[in-house]
Amino acid sequence: MHLIDSLETRTDWSKIFGVVDSLYNDKGFSSNADNFARATAVEKAIAKFSDLIRVDQTGYDFTFGDKKIELKMGKNLFYKRKDIHATKKFKVKSFLSEKKTVEDFRQSKTFDYMMVIDLTARRVVIVEDEHARSLYQTGADGAMIELKLGDYYECDLGGIITTTEPPTCLSDAINKAIEGYLNF
């Protein structure tokens, strides 16, 4: 089975986007410091409710068979009016810890597919590695990308998604775990 077929037919997007809704409506997550916990929870939800295996390696986040998948996600990635088939620029690689240029990143294959998820519009698109790398642009502190119609395959998620949220807030569970951890 191909990655796209699996994402379209064997992935429970109602639960994945339910996790997203729960995390972004969680009043206990209010600062940028919470972004890591949110991103990790979404990655783990994708792994639990799809055929992808979360590996969290440098340059890719999942595997699907022998294919490496890099995940990029964010709110409001696709334009709502200007061009609904185009994304705003978003960061794909960071220069902060490395002395690399955009050209270095264009030459370096680390994944087979980039999976881009717009958390607000509930859209999932797949970009092949070689094409993605050809679109890298220089940003303030890393390589950026901007996608247009023809740059990606958009997964058919079956129309309007009715979400199923987890029964508890993750921030509450984390706080209880920390309290228990410190109870010695």
Regions found by a protein language model. Give the residues of each.
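Nucleic-acid endonuclease domains
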Residues: M1-F184
